[in-house]
Amino acid sequence: MSTYTYSAGPGMLPTEVMQEIQQHLLTFEYEGVSIIETSHRSASFQRVVDSLEWRLRRLMHIPENYAVLWLQGGATLQFSMIPMNLRKQNRFAYVDTGIWSKKAMEDAKHFGEVDVIHPLVDATGGMSFESSLVQEVDYLHVTLNNTIEGTRFTHIPEIDVPLIADASSNILAEQIDVERFGVIYAGAQKNIGPAGLTVVIIRRDLIQSLQLPSYLQYASHVDTLFNTPSTFSMYAAERVLKWVEDCGGVEAMERLNRQKSDRIYSYLEESTCFSPIVTGERRSLTNIPFSTGNQELDQRFERYALERGLLELGGHRSVGGLRASLYNAMPLEGAERLVDVMRAFEEETHVSHQNI
């Protein structure tokens, strides 16, 4: 019986990638020298760095007027680095779509005034915002996919200021038009690789030389390894990106993610035991919150699923309930298995209620 983890992060990695990593933990380029012992200044690791960047550029169609930076500190550090590096008038706009956008806003308040914009939901349940509210700010920040709430933007209007996107939970999982954005950033631990690595895709004209601590300046990281990076995470990410290419690229990943999420949403809509938390077009492809409507029953199902090899189905500690995260490495079989286990639990629960 296969075991699947539905964790919101770190997420699953492809089995074949982990098997290759396992081999290189003992020998990478030289016999007896591990990838985690390989110098970040060596020619062999520079090839990893170059391949990592070019694979991402190919997969996301990133043009040359954008720099690709590989940093540490998680997406959380970007909550501060973005206002630090992009401020001119010291006024920023944020679309408030949930807990992670709120965290980004709170950090931005250390560097200037924050205009809060509330999302709009249309007749189909799609999510957008009113562009006329974005005025006289240095940038507008959006969280493209809300990991906790299970929502995603379905339309982003044109605006006259740089658009900044937290893409941590949907990067490489669905197509993103990079040239719509000034900055796209993402923690690696959902769709790119292991934790410990953050990617920042930034339009070069936004990079300034500022009076900031050296690591916190984007300019310090352009086209160079400024300090010792997370070498293992970068190596693993390069292998994951190769796997994505071999699978057919981001278009293929998006098709698969739609299949997986459709399987689960379809079941939730017909179930008499479980209900989806989100309805309409704004439902996330990668993070599906759901519930029985009863905390004790939710916890019973979580234990029931764990006994059957389905891990990390608890909702975020701030909201409770249940959640299934379906990042790229989760196969279609993982979504189908979850539906089978939910259906079995529903049948057993219904029978037990009948026998009371």
Swiss-Prot record:
- Pfam families named in the record: Aminotran_5
Q: What is this protein called?
A: Phosphoserine aminotransferase
Which source organism? Exiguobacterium sp. (strain ATCC BAA-1283 / AT1b)
Per the record, the domain of life is: Bacteria
Residues bound to pyridoxal 5'-phosphate are A75, T76, W100, T147, D166, Q189, N227, T228
Known catalysed reaction(s)? Answer: O-phospho-L-serine + 2-oxoglutarate = 3-phosphooxypyruvate + L-glutamate; 4-(phosphooxy)-L-threonine + 2-oxoglutarate = (R)-3-hydroxy-2-oxo-4-phosphooxybutanoate + L-glutamate
Keyword Nucleotidyltransferase attached: no
Per the record, the similarity remark reads: Belongs to the class-V pyridoxal-phosphate-dependent aminotransferase family. SerC subfamily.
Gene Ontology cellular-component terms listed = cytoplasm
**Cofactor, free-text remark:** Binds 1 pyridoxal phosphate per subunit.
Could you state one GO biological process linked to this protein? L-serine biosynthetic process
Give the cofactors, semicolon-separated.
pyridoxal 5'-phosphate
